[in-house]
């Protein structure tokens, strides 16, 4: 190949390379242009400024910008809801924090209680933070506030719980300490030792029951799903709950009466359901006069199975009926302590019901008695209308007479 031919070939190859490169470059350039046009089209509906405005408006924090004269130059709706700004006036505590922020400090504060109540939302716990808006322009401070009410309520509940547990544990522990001292002082008297030892055992059992109930309540209040959900026979639940307290009923000469077997079924944790119903039976026995009747009934009502426990006891005052399911709540404290209960039984019932997507409700009249009704979703079974068992048709055949009246009339 001559030098001329070689140069000619090199020139052709170079030309081809340039042509291909140009084509590719044009294609890439057109793609970039198309992409930019598409992005521009997508953003044409909202500007960055509008987007930021939407974010500030919708965020759960209250925000306000204030100048050195206490004039509020910007705020979002949440700032008014939380009491940071009212009638364009910054909260007193917030303004004190803002003045420090204008001096270059970052300040945390709590809103004034007076301002929070003025918003009509009592019980709010609002925490705030103030800082300089910009180092370049020191005329403005920005103040943020957020609602800490849930956290404050949780902390209050935790403190109450610790205080209640400490108080409840102090009684059996103190009793056991005194009994132990008495035992040491009576070591030579076998009869006295035996009597005090029996009392120590009673207090130890009470303490053990309380700890077990605390553990159970803690587990029920957790977020985990119940692990042992099975097809549960309601009649079995009733029988086991009664058997747990047969001795206590016999000792108090109380008859525990039930209606006929129902063949009703629910989906649930059998152990927890028995525990819940047993707690209701235990309460009914404990608060009933000697020689009275405690009755248990079960029925299907719509999509639910209802198990009702009725006593003819002292009843519950109307002002206490909403609180009986709280931990450690006792209406008649003297009577409650005499029964030896921990004050946790009904709280456990409430959480067992909630974990089964059910409910627990109470009807009571002082001097007449009480009915606690545990309602649980019925087990769904595929029956044709003409093949449903008698129990499934019960709501259609049963009279409208209330279950409570039926139980109390027995």
From Swiss-Prot:
Coiled coil: none annotated. One of its GO terms (biological process) is phosphorelay signal transduction system. Disulfide bonds: none annotated. Residues 385-410 are annotated as: Disordered. Its EC number is 2.7.13.3. It holds the Pfam family HATPase_c. Binds heme and acts as a three-way sensor with three levels of activity. The oxidation of the heme by oxygen leads to the activation of the autokinase activity, whereas the deoxy-ferrous state confers a moderate kinase activity. Kinase activity is strongly inhibited by binding of NO and CO, which lock SenX3 in an inactive state. Activation of the SenX3-RegX3 two-component system is inhibited by PhoY1 and PhoY2 when phosphate is readily available. It is an enzyme of class 2 (transferase). SUPFAM superfamilies: ATPase domain of HSP90 chaperone/DNA topoisomerase II/histidine kinase, Homodimeric domain of signal transducing histidine kinase. InterPro entries: 2-comp_sensor_kinase, HATPase_C_sf, His_kinase_dom, HisK_dim/P_dom, HisK_dim/P_sf, Sig_transdc_His_kin-like_C. Autophosphorylated. Residues 164-380 form the Histidine kinase domain. This is Sensor-like histidine kinase SenX3. Keywords: ATP-binding, Cell membrane, Kinase, Membrane, Nucleotide-binding, Phosphoprotein, Stress response, Transferase, Transmembrane, Transmembrane helix, Two-component regulatory system, Virulence. GO terms for molecular function: ATP binding; histidine phosphotransfer kinase activity; phosphorelay sensor kinase activity. The keyword Transmembrane applies. The modification Phosphohistidine is found at residue 167. It is a multi-pass membrane protein. Disruption phenotype: The senX3-regX3 deletion mutant shows a growth defect after infection of macrophages and is attenuated in both immunodeficient and immunocompetent mice. It is found in: Cell membrane. Member of the two-component regulatory system SenX3/RegX3 involved in stress response. Autophosphorylates, and then transfers the phosphate group to RegX3. The system is involved in phosphate starvation response. Plays a role in modulating expression of aerobic response and in the regulation of response to hypoxia. Involved in virulence. SenX3 is a key regulator of mycobacterial replication in response to oxygen, nitric oxide (NO) and carbon monoxide (CO), and acts as an O(2) sensor that plays an important role in the reactivation of growth in response to the restoration of aerobic conditions.
């Amino acid at each position: 190949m001559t030098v001329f031919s070689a140069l000619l070939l090199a020139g052709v190859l170079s030309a081809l390379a340039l042509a291909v490169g140009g084509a590719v470059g044009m294609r890439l350039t057109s793609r970039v242009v198309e992409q930019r046009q598409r992005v521009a089209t997508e953003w044409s509906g909202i500007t960055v400024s509008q987007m930021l405005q939407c974010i500030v408006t919708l965020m759960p924090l209250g925000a306000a910008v204030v100048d050195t004269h206490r004039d509020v130059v910007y705020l979002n709706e949440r700032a008014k809801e939380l009491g940071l700004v009212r009638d364009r006036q910054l909260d007193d505590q917030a303004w004190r924090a803002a003045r420090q922020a204008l001096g270059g400090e970052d300040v945390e504060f709590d809103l004034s209680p007076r301002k929070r109540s003025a918003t009509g939302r009592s019980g709010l716990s609002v925490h705030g933070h103030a800082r300089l808006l910009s180092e370049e322009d020191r005329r403005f401070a920005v103040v943020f506030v957020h609602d800490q009410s849930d956290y404050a309520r949780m902390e209050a509940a935790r403190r109450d719980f610790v205080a209640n547990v400490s108080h409840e544990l102090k009684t059996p522990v103190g009793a056991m300490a005194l009994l132990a001292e008495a035992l040491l002082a009576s070591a030579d008297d076998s009869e006295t030792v035996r009597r005090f030892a029996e009392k120590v055992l009673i207090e130890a059992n009470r303490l053990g029951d309380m700890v077990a109930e605390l553990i159970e309540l803690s587990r029920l209040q957790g977020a985990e799903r119940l692990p042992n959900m099975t097809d549960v026979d309601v009649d079995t639940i009733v029988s086991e709950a009664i058997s747990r307290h047969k001795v206590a009923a016999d000792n108090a000469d109380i008859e525990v009466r039930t209606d006929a077997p129902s063949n009703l079924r629910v989906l649930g944790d059998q152990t927890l359901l028995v525990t819940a119903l047993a707690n209701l039976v235990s309460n009914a026995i404990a608060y009933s006069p000697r020689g009275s009747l405690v009755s248990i009934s079960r029925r299907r009502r719509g999509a639910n199975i209802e198990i009702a426990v009725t006593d003819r006891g002292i009843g519950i005052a109307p002002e206490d009926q909403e609180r009986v399911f709280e931990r450690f709540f006792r209406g008649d404290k003297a009577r409650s302590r005499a029964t030896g209960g921990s004050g946790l039984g009904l709280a456990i019932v409430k959480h067992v019901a909630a974990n089964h997507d059910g409910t627990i409700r109470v009807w009571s009249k002082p001097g007449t008695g009480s009915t606690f009704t545990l309602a649980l979703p019925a087990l769904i079974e595929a029956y044709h209308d003409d093949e449903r068992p008698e129990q499934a048709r019960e709501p259609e055949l049963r009279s409208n007479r209330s279950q409570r009246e039926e139980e109390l009339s027995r």
